Amino acid sequence: NWCRFAIWLTRVVAGIRYEVRGLENIPEKPCVILSKHQSTWETFFLTGYFEPLAQVLKRELLFVPFFGWALALLKPIAIDRSQPKLALKQLAKQGDECLKKGAWVLIFPEGTRIPVGQMGKFSRGGTALAVNANLPVLPIAHNAGHCWPKNGWAKYPGTIQVVIGPAMHAEGEGPRAIAELNQRAEAWVSETMAEISPIQQRVSHPEPSVVS
């Protein structure tokens, strides 16, 4: 597909290669993928690597000339972030439908591309979707931002490290289980980023408040 072509093109034109670790952690049955978000590269890579896949993205991206039109062809789960409650309902409904059809659901829980060296707070939408579907989440860390920065057109040659973590299951149900699973996934991504990204800063967050 065109996503694989884009990755091939970046290798040929910009000298951007990649290495993947943790392939043995990929479950046989599709589940919810929670990926670090630094650049556009991982959007192409993960969409081409996990098939079939539905990516959760902000609706306004679909209106970007050419890029947005191409995204629309992938039939993403487009949410309206200006209406948080509606966005959660859209994610829950459409995400569950995709999972039942045997498709992976890709979520960037930080919500936007985060500069190299920083970690954004993980939203719980992805873990809520997984818990309600009785499926695990698959955390993924990478350092694509070193070769493909968030801002600007410049691309830098190098080898991107992609690390697929162990599938994580919730311990129980409800808000408390969702929060605990989300915290585990966020901690794993943060720890792994500290290993593969030399200037990565570990960011600690206060314990999430949970209504039991």
Predicted regions and their residues:
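Catalytic core of membrane glycerolipid acyltransferases/transacylases, capturing the structured
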Residues: 4-5, 11-13, 28-84
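A generic structural signal for well-ordered alpha-helical segments
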Residues: 10-11, 71, 98, 130
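Generic preference for hydrophobic
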Residues: 20, 33, 55-56, 162-164
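Thr-Gly-centered strand-to-loop micro-motif
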Residues: 21, 57-58, 79-81, 109, ...
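Glycine-rich helix-loop-beta junction characteristic of Rossmann-like nucleotide cofactor-binding loops
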Residues: 22-26
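A short, glycine/Asx- and small/polar-enriched loop/turn
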Residues: 27-29, 156-157
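Non-catalytic C-terminal accessory region of glycerolipid acyltransferases
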Residues: 88-212
